[in-house]
Structure formats: structure tokens, C-alpha cells
Regions:
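Membrane-interface helix termini and inter-helical loops of multi-pass transporters
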Residues: 75-83, 131-144, 232-241
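Loop-to-transmembrane alpha-helix initiation sites
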Residues: 239-249
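Membrane-interface helix-boundary motifs at transmembrane edges
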Residues: 6-15, 50, 105-111, 211
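Transmembrane helix exit motif
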Residues: 1-9, 101-109, 118-140, 253-270
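Small-residue-rich hydrophobic segments that form or flank transmembrane alpha-helices
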Residues: 14-93, 149-228, 232, 236, ...
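Alpha-helical multi-pass membrane helix bundles of inner-membrane/thylakoid proteins
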Residues: 10-15, 133-156, 266-274
């Protein structure tokens, strides 16, 4: 935070200030709900031209570090999770980011997005069927054991690896937790904790090289903290049934978004060739 203030840019307009703080609040509020903050923030910065393209990656990673850490800490204190499940999924997630990431970066991103998008839409449909009593999914467990714990750990490994190529882990983690019979609230400390670990590691190179917009990063952090506090209170106050519907909506939203991203890249490439 000291670095953001000390090296802040001069000549920032009131419009830019408004964008920085509004984006910080709104993006982090919805990040807590599992929708994610990086993609909408990147799009807003590009649309409003308030942050140079080469500074956007560093601004996003540095700006969201403190809010994501706060999310993780708040959910860890407010949501009960069995320690074996938490440590197992955290550990496999860290290993997945370090080892699995090397494999994931060699795979075609388009194919990964399509696979994940179709998977999320299919899972969303199954979860919706369970809400109407057509499928035996969901539950209220706060921990996993046996084969279910193994599946969860393998899933955390894979999702953390995919995170290194820009495929978010929030929605898939929520879906995995739901389908393994756990309380949907348990997904929040798990996915936020893994996100915090990844963001902390990723922010150091940008901070050291000073490749980020200081005003935008500070505003994203300051307003983001407020957004996180409000959203965490709302999420932890929601009844189980509402949380289950939230997971279903996030699954459909993220699945459609991933498919659009996959085919949008292809259409852009064809247009450039034409």
C-alpha cells in the first residue's frame, strides 16, 4: 500500500478516480459470490481506457491481493470446514499450481475452455435437477472422507493447474463441493484460500518491477475491502437453499462465459486473417 501511494501517477481525472473505486467495489463484491473479479475489471479498464494495456495485468494482481486474502480469512473464521478436507485440498492445490501448471501451459487453451464450459453447463443442469428431486446431489457435510476426499484433492490439483492458464477455479470448485455432498458454503474458504495463495505469489514480480497503475491498484484494494466485507456478511447469512441456487447460477454463468471466450478468440483470428 505504501508503494502504491508513494509512486502514484499525476494528473488523474475525477472520471478515472470514479472508475477505479467503483470497479474495485463492484468487482470484489461479486468476486465473493464466486463470479470472479479479474475478467470484468479487465474489460472495464479497456472499455474506459483508464489503465494502459501493459499495466492492466500487474494492476489486477496487486490490487486484488489484499481483498482476496481478506476473503479467505473471513470465510475461514465464519464457515466450518473439517481440517483434513481443508489441508488436503489446499495442499493439492499448491502442488497443482507448481507442478500441474507446467503441463497445463502446454495444452490448447481453447480446448480447455470448451471442456470446462460444457462441464459447468452439464453440472448446472444436474444440480438444477437435484433441486427438483430428480437427482440425489447436494448435502450439508462440512468435510469429506475416503474416495470423496481423494476426488476433491485431485480436483483441487487440476483446477489449480488450470488457473495458471487463466481458467478460473471459483465456479468449478463450487460445483465440485456441491456434487460431493458438502454444504455449498464450504466452497468459499477453499476457493478463496487457493486464490489468495496464487495471487500473493503472482503479485511480487509486478510489484518489484513497478509495472502496475498505482492509483488504480490502490483504489481497487481500498474499495474492494469494503465490497468484500459487505458480500461476506451477505453470503454467510444466506440459507442453504439460496446458496445452492447461487452455485447453480454461477455454474451456468461461468460455463456460458467460457464458451463465449473460447469461440470469440477463434472469430477474432478469422477476422484478422480475412
Amino acid at each position: 500500500v505504501h508503494g502504491m501511494i508513494k509512486h502514484r501517477e499525476k494528473g488523474v481525472t475525477p472520471f478515472q478516480y470514479a472508475v477505479y473505486y467503483l470497479v474495485g467495489f463492484i468487482a470484489n463484491f461479486f468476486d465473493v459470490l464466486g463470479i470472479g473479479s479479474l475478467a470484468p475489471t479487465l474489460a472495464t479498464y479497456k472499455l474506459t481506457k483508464t489503465v494502459d494495456d501493459d499495466l492492466i495485468p500487474g494492476t489486477l494482481v496487486i490490487g486484488c491481493a489484499i481483498p482476496v486474502i481478506l476473503e479467505a480469512l473471513l470465510f475461514l473464521t465464519k464457515v466450518e470446514v473439517e481440517i483434513l478436507t481443508l489441508v488436503g485440498m489446499y495442499g493439492c492445490g499448491i502442488i497443482g499450481a507448481l507442478i500441474g501448471g507446467k503441463v497445463a501451459t502446454k495444452l490448447p487453451v481453447k480446448a480447455l475452455r470448451i471442456t470446462m464450459g460444457v462441464g459447468l453447463l452439464s453440472a448446472g443442469a444436474l444440480m438444477m435437477m437435484s433441486k427438483f428431486g430428480l437427482m440425489p446431489l447436494g448435502g450439508n457435510a462440512i468435510g469429506l472422507h475416503g474416495i470423496k476426499l481423494v476426488i476433491a484433492c485431485i480436483g483441487s490439483f487440476i483446477l489449480a493447474a488450470l488457473l495458471t492458464v487463466g481458467i478460473g477455479n471459483y465456479a468449478p470448485t463450487m460445483v465440485m463441493v456441491y456434487m460431493l455432498g458438502m454444504n455449498p458454503a464450504v466452497a468459499f474458504p477453499i476457493m478463496m484460500g487457493l486464490g489468495a495463495l496464487g495471487v500473493c505469489n503472482g503479485s511480487f514480480p509486478y510489484f518489484a518491477s513497478n509495472r502496475y497503475h498505482h492509483h488504480a491498484a490502490f483504489a481497487f484494494t481500498a474499495a474492494g475491502v469494503v465490497g468484500v466485507l459487505i458480500a461476506v456478511y451477505l453470503v454467510t447469512s444466506l440459507p442453504l437453499s439460496v446458496l445452492q441456487w447461487l452455485v447453480i447460477l454461477v455454474a451456468f454463468y461461468t460455463g456460458i462465459t467460457m464458451l463465449k471466450q473460447a469461440f470469440a478468440r477463434e472469430n477474432v483470428a478469422k477476422a484478422n486473417v480475412g
